C-alpha cells in the first residue's frame, strides 16, 4: 500500500464521524440479519411481551457493554485514574487528572452509545419487535365482534395477531388496524429516540468542552499526543521486552534461541526453577525497579556461569 493510502486510511480510522458511521452501518446490517434468521414471535399469552422486549433491549445492552469493553481508553481510565479507596497512594490522581479522565470518559461513552442507539432506532422504526411485545395489550373495545368474547379468549386472539397468516374475514381488518397502530407507535418512539439522542449528544459535547480544563487547540493536541504516545510506547515496549527476555533467558540457560554458535549452555538449579515458577508483579510499592518477568532477578551475576555447572558445546 502506498504512503498516501496509508495516510488516508490512518486518518479515516482516527476520524470519529467515519468510525461512528461505520459502527452504525454494521449495526443496521447485523440487526437485519438477526431479525431475519432468529426472531419469531411466539404468539402466546404472557410470552409475547417478554420475547419482544428481550429482542429489543438485550442486544442493545450487549452492544453497550461491548462498546465500553472494546475501547482501550476505557481500561486506561479505569487503571490510571481510579479513585477507589483501595487504590495505592502512589497511583492516586490529582483533581486535574480526574477532570481529564472525565473528559475522556465522555468521549468513550459517546462512541459506546452509537451501536445500541442505532439498534434501538432501527428496531423501533421497523416495528417488528414492538408489534410482538404490544400485541396482547391492544385496545379492541371499539370492535363489536369482541363484545361477547371472554377476557381470556380475547387475550389469546390478540396474542395470535402477529402470527395470523389466514384468519376469518371479520378478523383481518381488525388485525391490520392493530398492526398499523403498533407500527405507528413504534416508529414514533424511534423518531423520539433519535431526537433525544441527538440533543443528549450535543449537550454532552458542549458540557464536556465547557468543563474541560483544555482549550480547543489544547484538546486537539492532547488527543494526538495520547494516540502517538500509545503507538510509540507499544513499539518500544515490544522491543524492550524482547531484549530483556533474551538477556534473562541467556542468564538462565546460557544461550539465546536462534544463536548459531552455541559453545556453552547452563543447567538451571532447582532454586532457579522454583523462583521462575512464581510470577512477579511489576513495580509494586515504592521499589525502584521491578523484576518484570517470570524469570526473576536471581541469575544476574556476571560470574554466575563460573559457579554453576554447565556444559561446553563443542563445534
Swiss-Prot record:
GO process annotations (BP): ATP export; monoatomic ion transmembrane transport
InterPro entries: CALHM
Source organism, top-level taxon: Eukaryota
Membrane-protein topology: Multi-pass membrane protein
Residues that span the membrane, as ranges: 15-37, 49-71, 105-130, 185-208
Extracellular side: 38-48, 131-184
Protein's recorded name: Calcium homeostasis modulator protein 4
Gene behind the chain: Calhm4
